A protein has these predicted regions:
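Formylglycine-dependent sulfatase
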Residues: 1-285
């Protein structure tokens, strides 16, 4: 989305943690060169981690990826507030689907922290310039460690069972793709789905705070809000997890545009196939 390039062009075809960004103009750089104040808060997932990819500044929360050579701003904040080294004491992995409630204070949850930092930047905005702000939440991606407040909302909900299938049981490729999900019991799968939905609801509540901050800063009426994601999650549908295939749950992500400047388009639905890199030109128009 930031480069407007397909994997065929930018070269990262297999998810490479240590592949540097291509030397091309980015979406953030384009906005900045056209007079916009630019800021990113949350997860950028680029290498090296402190590469600002065209933003004037970034405040990072990168899921504790110490092996990539940088300490992010969330880790620094944890250390300053008595939580040094405690982020992963919940013992849940970044790519597993076991779950438990968040183990630290609510303010220390990455979703809350990213929201507060973004609210601060909205309040600190230069009043003489338009702005392009990027707020990126790492959740609901595992680890599945929701706040108990939101997990409790789903304890009594009868959730739909994962979609199953058996017509490819003799396919070696399909069996290999299902191995990652096959280690979980039926009870663990139900817990994982509840936790995933709870983390989505948590973000919904935090977005309310961001919208409220825009409103009280007299910015909401002139702001276009864009809600999107990089990928979905199979969440045990078809006996799979994560994003290893081109089934709908993994590839069909939201692209919702909202705001008073788009009032004439309220309720419009575009059903054409789109991609992450096709968003770049739309945002920059």
């Amino acid at each position: 989305m930031m480069t407007g390039l397909s994997p065929k062009t930018h070269g990262d075809r297999v998810y490479s943690d240590r592949m540097e960004m291509p030397d091309v103009p980015t979406l953030a750089e384009t906005f900045r060169k056209n007079g916009y104040q630019t800021m990113a808060v949350g997860k950028l997932h680029v290498y090296p981690q402190r590469n600002r990819i065209g933003f004037e500044d970034v405040i990072l929360a990168e899921e504790g990826r110490y092996e990539l050579g940088a300490v992010d701003d969330y880790q620094i904040w944890l250390g300053e507030h008595g939580y040094l080294g405690k982020e992963f004491l919940h013992a849940m992995g970044n790519n597993t689907y076991y779950t438990r409630p968040w183990h630290l204070d609510e303010q220390a949850h990455p979703t809350n922290w990213v929201t507060m930092e973004m609210m601060h930047q909205i309040k600190r905005k230069d009043p003489t310039r338009p702005f392009f702000f990027y707020c990126s939440y790492q959740f609901p991606h595992p680890p599945l460690v929701p706040l108990s407040t939101f997990l409790d909302m789903y304890q009594e909900e009868e959730l739909e069972e994962p979609i199953g299938q058996d017509w490819l049981d003799d396919s070696y490729i399909f069996k290999a793709m299902c191995e990652a999900a096959g280690i979980y019991t039926e009870k663990e799968i139900k817990r994982a789905r509840r936790a995933f939905f709870a983390q989505c609801t948590h973000i919904d509540y935090q977005i309310r705070l961001l919208i409220g901050t825009l409103r009280e800063s007299n910015l909401l009426d002139d702001t276009i809000l864009v809600f999107t994601s990089d990928h979905g999650d199979m969440l045990f549908d078809h006996n799979m997890v994560a994003k290893r295939c081109f089934y709908e749950n993994a590839t069909c992500v939201p692209l919702i545009l909202s705001g008073k400047p788009l009032e004439n388009y309220r309720g419009t639905v575009e059903k054409k196939l789109g991609t992450s890199y096709s968003k770049t030109g739309q945002f920059a128009i």
